[in-house]
């Protein structure tokens, strides 16, 4: 007797990580990442010689050292935490729906791939799949890239599954509540700094002027979080991190802001990265280590990084709610 097929399956998607903190593995990862036209939309005739001839011959060794500074005995922080998220969400969903609901990971770049995630869900009998990109704010460089990868996979499938695709959740009540809880928990332990800095991953300014809603959604998230925390306008500020290349990106830049704040008389900051659902190189190294050094070197006295939501209970609850909202029509029709 075969087991009944699950009501649906869930594919949790994040950006990805190198398999190892080595130049070879990082080069392989960067090649795939930076070859995505959603990430770098320059003409391949212009971009690929730069990527293949310069970037992939200079950056992997440097970036590998950065990964080594945050790598754990269990592996990449992003991968370890993502696995915990998937396991806890599967447990939560299975209890909610009173049956086994499979949850698999799929990374836009690196392993496990989005294709392998679909294959695992199919092997478990899932004919309906919710694709849940772990990007609260929509951007063409992240969420649309996931959509492209899903669509590309489906072009090679004879019998495609029924799909639900969660585009964004930047203003979801449960998301704002989870962020607010993480900040309040931090304040309870460490006290409240003079200013809360909300650092979002940046994108080229051109993407925004061409219609990407990402910066507006980031500012909406920030405003809602500040309201939930009861902060005045002078107690919080938005910035954008991780810029790459010579093109102008969204401003203010995180490193420049944190270097300037002590000169404005701000001596203590708490920094949170709301656009990241999972701690990774950009939060654990760039913000928790590098940005801290920038702030303290400029004359700051106290710098605290507030971790991402990761596998916190309220975050898993949020993910469950997002899945329930996407599957409402499926369940009600049965």
Curated annotation (Swiss-Prot):
Residue numbers binding Fe cation: 201, 282
InterPro entries per UniProt: Ferrochelatase, Ferrochelatase_AS, Ferrochelatase_C, Ferrochelatase_N
Localization in the cell: Cytoplasm
GO BP, sorted A to Z: heme biosynthetic process
Family: Belongs to the ferrochelatase family.
Chief site of localization: cytoplasm
Enzyme category, top tier: lyase
EC numbers for this chain: 4.98.1.1
UniProt cross-references to CDD domains, sorted A to Z: Ferrochelatase_C, Ferrochelatase_N
Database matches in SUPFAM superfamilies: Chelatase
Name of the protein in question: Ferrochelatase 1
């Amino acid at each position: 007797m075969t087991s009944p097929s699950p009501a649906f399956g869930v594919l949790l998607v994040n950006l990805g990580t190198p398999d190892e903190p080595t130049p070879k593995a990082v080069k392989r990862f960067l090649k795939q990442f930076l070859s995505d036209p959603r990430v770098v939309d320059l003409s391949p005739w212009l971009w690929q010689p730069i990527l293949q001839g310069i970037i992939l011959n200079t950056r992997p060794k440097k970036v590998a050292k950065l990964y080594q500074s945050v790598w754990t005995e269990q592996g990449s922080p992003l991968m370890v935490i993502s696995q915990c998220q998937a396991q806890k969400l599967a447990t939560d969903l299975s209890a909610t729906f009173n049956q086994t609901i499979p949850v698999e990971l799929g990374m836009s770049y690196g392993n496990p791939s989005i294709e392998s995630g679909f294959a695992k869900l199919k092997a478990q009998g899932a004919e309906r799949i919710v694709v849940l990109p772990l990007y609260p704010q929509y951007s063409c460089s992240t969420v649309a890239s996931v959509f492209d990868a899903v669509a590309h996979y489906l072009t090679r499938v004879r019998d495609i599954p029924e799909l639900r695709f969660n585009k964004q959740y930047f203003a979801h009540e449960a998301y704002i509540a989870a962020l607010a809880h993480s900040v309040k928990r931090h304040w309870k332990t460490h006290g409240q700094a003079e200013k809360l800095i909300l650092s979002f991953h940046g994108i080229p300014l051109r993407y925004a002027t061409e219609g990407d809603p990402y910066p507006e959604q980031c500012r909406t998230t920030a405003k809602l979080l500040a309201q939930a925390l009861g902060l005045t306008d002078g107690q919080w500020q938005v910035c954008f991190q991780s810029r790459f290349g010579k093109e102008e990106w969204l401003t203010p830049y995180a490193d420049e802001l944190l270097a300037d704040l002590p000169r404005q008389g701000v001596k203590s900051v708490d920094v949170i990265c709301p656009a990241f659902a999972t701690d990774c190189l950009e939060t654990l190294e760039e913000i928790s280590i590098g940005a801290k050094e920038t702030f303290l070197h400029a004359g700051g006295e106290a710098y605290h990084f507030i971790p991402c939501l990761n596998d916190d209970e309220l975050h898993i609850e949020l993910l469950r709610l997002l899945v329930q909202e996407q599957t409402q029509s499926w369940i009600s029709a049965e």
